[in-house]
Amino acid sequence: MRYKSMGDSLSIRNEKAFEAALQALRRHAIKDGVYDIRRHFIEDEQRFSNFSLNLDDFLFDFSKCGVTFKTLQLLDDLAVAADVLGRRDAMFSGKAINTTEKRSVLHIALRLPADEVFMLDGTDLVHDIQGVLADMERFSDMVRDGSYKGNSGEKIIDIVNIGIGGSDLGPAMVTYALKPYHDGPNCHFVSNADSAHISDTLSVLNPATTLFVIASKTFTTAETIANAQVARQWIMSHLGKEAVCKHFIAVSSALDKVAEFGIDSSRTFRFWDWVGGRYSIWSAIGLVVMLAIGGQNFRQFLEGAQHMDRHFKTAPLRKNIPIRFALLGFWHRVVCGYASRAVIPYAQRLARFPAYLQQLDMESNGKQVSLDGKTLTFSSGPVVWGDSGTNGQHAFFQLLHQGTDVIPVEFILFIKGHEQNLHPMYDMLVANCLAQSKALMKGRSVEDARRMLLKSGIDERESENLALHKSFAGNRPNMMLVQDLLTPFALGRLIALYEHRIFVEGILMNINSFDQWGVELGKELANELLPILRGENKTNNRDSSTLGLLAHIQARRGE
């Protein structure tokens, strides 16, 4: 297939049509009140099949959300009014949909098959991408088979990825998630400016067998460069200055700065300005993943994402999983007013997935200004949080079941585990996931709780008092994402689903999901405060709180 950029113009949606569709949706919600999900299952024996979608072995079950056929139709009308399909096609055609930075958004190109063509500004992106992938694979194979050696001639045993944000969250999450496929060197991740992070990591490593991957597009990210400098000094102090070139590689587009650091261009893997940090796991930022699981498995990871890309690009509106997922998210956030969503993977190896999604979702859709420069009149992206099941059941599920806020839950489940000898234990995990989903929807009435207490031998008066505490309102919306097994392909498909879902929610909110200006002010102020904290500059034009905190810190340090 041949793709070609269609230029930079981006259509402006008809706000009157969108507002009319949104008001119709809100009137529908007010008229029907709070939907009783339990009643829907009683009235519609085909509720599950009518309110779920499949993509091969991928199942998206949204039957436990408080929506009806009418709701879905009104949501589809909203998608049409927002020109979701047109905006989707604009991304796939290479238009500069990142309007504030005037950039195309083409992480989707990173996972295109080698035999396809994607032209942007006269350049075939697929040719360039495949070239970098081939370079990554050659280098990865050398490290993994031991032919690439450190300065003292020893095989590389440990990899330390130094990055932050998208250069850390994605690689760390994916490497941990794909542990059963990890047959390469040990992988470690350093991101925080807290010196403890780099110090604790280095304390257990051998310099002669350690390779550092410095991941920074601009090679100016403060935390990353600070950690990289500590690592470089560590290598030089043990192996000498000449060892830097053998023990450091870079993933960056700033070749001049990489060279200044001491890393040769032959050990630098590049990526492009149309790759946003939180979408960069598919690029050379994923090098540490390839080092861990090998090139073939990494390509399976890309193919899984491409599978979801094709579905998102070609499936009709009503059968399109990312679009339906996004419309339900918009319904929960904007129409129902639910302020957060919990993502609970019933897979310990996906324990880092909620943190990964926090950046992907909240950095994308945590905006207050629309594409046409107006302040939003409704809530934008929700707070995203979660943990792995069953751990979360013993931590925060109390709030999900009986708290005063309704928090939609997104369960992620795999039918099988990798540990076949522990199959009965995995059955326990699956049973718990299904049970929690049902419990959130079904709840337990006060009367049922009272009967249960009486049956257990508790007297009537105490049963009456305890029944309220042991009742559950139920009717808590939740969705289930089910795949067969956590493989590189399955993980790639899951991540791509969330990428597209977040993009579509941004379209519905009429915001730019691909910039992140909100992180800049804090960086600027930190740069101003650092020399003051070090006593190099005097304080001025500071608020009393900042002045007081600085004075307290300096006094306690004895400065």
UniProtKB/Swiss-Prot annotation:
Do the record's keywords include Isomerase?
A: yes
- The answer to whether keyword Transmembrane applies is no
Function (record text): Catalyzes the reversible isomerization of glucose-6-phosphate to fructose-6-phosphate.
HAMAP family, A to Z: G6P_isomerase
* Pfam families referenced in this protein's UniProt entry, alphabetically: PGI
Q: Where is this protein chiefly located?
A: cytoplasm
Q: Where in the cell is it found?
A: Cytoplasm
Q: Name one GO cellular component term.
A: cytosol
Provide the taxonomic classification.
Bacteria, Pseudomonadati, Pseudomonadota, Alphaproteobacteria, Hyphomicrobiales
User: What protein family is recorded?
Assistant: Belongs to the GPI family.
Q: What is its EC number?
A: 5.3.1.9
Question: Which residues does UniProt mark as catalytic?
Answer: E363 (proton donor), H394, K523
What reaction is this protein's catalytic activity? Answer: alpha-D-glucose 6-phosphate = beta-D-fructose 6-phosphate
Recall the GO molecular function terms of this protein's record: carbohydrate derivative binding; glucose-6-phosphate isomerase activity; monosaccharide binding
Name-wise, this protein is Glucose-6-phosphate isomerase
State which pathway it belongs to. Carbohydrate biosynthesis; gluconeogenesis; Carbohydrate degradation; glycolysis; D-glyceraldehyde 3-phosphate and glycerone phosphate from D-glucose: step 2/4
- A GO BP term, please? glucose 6-phosphate metabolic process
InterPro entries xref list:
G6P_Isomerase, G6P_Isomerase_C, Phosphoglucose_isomerase_CS, SIS_dom_sf, SIS_PGI_1, SIS_PGI_2
Query: Which keywords does this Swiss-Prot/TrEMBL entry list?
Result: Cytoplasm, Gluconeogenesis, Glycolysis, Isomerase
Provide the gene name from the record: pgi
Q: Which superkingdom heads the taxonomic lineage of this protein's source?
A: Bacteria
